[in-house]
């Protein structure tokens, strides 16, 4: 989640959560663009024809500056419901993402809301979750593998790929659990920094090519890039284990604390558009779980 986490402690920030949307970019600075042309700062969404979204310009499958990510599609759906035009403020999703965007020391902040934050993330006011996903095993179909648990003894014999998250190379929750089981020497780390296009895809490419036998990956990343492979891949949710680190997360939208009006409007839109949102998620290969806290 570049933190690949866009949930590590924040989806992508630090610690074992999933990715804030999904990754942590090495990009710095920001640029603001509308649906077609650049524009200056907009006022609050409630009174503006613009709908300001802070997002990462190079963080597929979540978002990019071409509007191809599932968060781009969902943001466009919400903006349409508001009768507004989506306007993006691009900022690399890394440490300080919320501080430098929504909570920037500007009168209105840089944007009105962000996508893809963990439910109840304390730097913002979160909406009800609009989806729930999980870390998954990814391995080729038809090669005799049937991994359903981190306790499967075959994991000690396979080459396992994992994402290393964030600037300090934090590991996602399943990797902590592998370590507890003594599965260490056969684990290969893949970084998520953007020195090349779509770096999170490298781990899925490696599974398809046979460079590694199985990968443990955040579901939205795994599902999206697995769909692009010629080799059919199996995605199996990693079941929870006893401990402090969950593998599945509820994902919400975040608005600036105190903006009750926008929070209420977003909640109403989510209620109206949940079926369409789920179609977008499924179209992008996101593995969806039953909600834990309020997805309808």
Show where each model-derived region lies.
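Signal peptide processing junction and immediate N-terminal pro/mature segment
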Residues: 15-36
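Acidic, polar ligand-binding/catalytic clefts
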Residues: 28, 76, 85-155, 165-168, ...
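Extracytoplasmic small-molecule ligand-binding "clamshell" domains
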Residues: 38-117, 121-122, 193-197, 283-284
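Periplasmic-binding protein-like
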Residues: 56-59, 132-136, 144, 227-270, ...
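Bilobed "Venus flytrap"/periplasmic-binding protein-like clamshell domains
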Residues: 57-60, 65-81, 137-199, 220-221
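Alpha-to-beta junction loops
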Residues: 84-85, 103-116, 158-159, 202-203, ...
């Amino acid at each position: 989640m570049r933190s690949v986490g866009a949930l590590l402690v924040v989806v992508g920030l630090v610690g074992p959560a999933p990715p804030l949307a999904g990754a942590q970019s090495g990009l710095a600075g920001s640029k603001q663009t509308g649906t077609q042309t650049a524009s200056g700062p907009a006022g609050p969404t409630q009174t503006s024809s613009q709908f300001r979204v802070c997002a990462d310009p190079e963080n597929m499958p979540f978002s990019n500056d071409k509007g191809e990510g599932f968060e781009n599609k969902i943001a466009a759906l919400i903006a349409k419901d508001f009768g507004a035009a989506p306007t993006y403020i691009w900022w690399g999703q890394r440490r300080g993402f919320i501080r430098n965007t929504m909570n920037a020391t500007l009168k209105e902040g840089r944007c009105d809301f962000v996508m893809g934050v963990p439910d109840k993330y304390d730097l913002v006011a979160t909406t009800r979750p609009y989806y729930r996903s999980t870390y998954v095993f990814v391995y080729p179909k038809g090669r005799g593998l049937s991994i359903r648990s981190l306790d499967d003894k075959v994991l000690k014999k396979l080459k396992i790929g994992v994402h290393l998250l964030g600037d300090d190379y934090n590991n996602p929750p399943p990797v902590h659990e592998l370590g507890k089981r003594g599965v260490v020497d056969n684990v290969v780390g893949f970084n998520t920094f953007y020195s090349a296009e779509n770096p999170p895809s490298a781990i899925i490419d490696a599974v398809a090519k046979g460079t590694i036998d199985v990968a443990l990956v955040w579901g939205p990343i795994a599902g999206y890039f697995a769909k692009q492979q010629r080799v059919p891949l199996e995605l199996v949710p990693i079941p929870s284990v006893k401990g402090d680190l969950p593998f599945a997360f509820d994902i919400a939208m975040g608005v600036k604390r105190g903006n009750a009006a926008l929070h209420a409007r977003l909640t109403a839109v989510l209620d109206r558009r949940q079926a369409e949102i789920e179609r977008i998620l499924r179209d992008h290969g996101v593995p969806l779980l039953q909600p834990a806290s309020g997805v309808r």
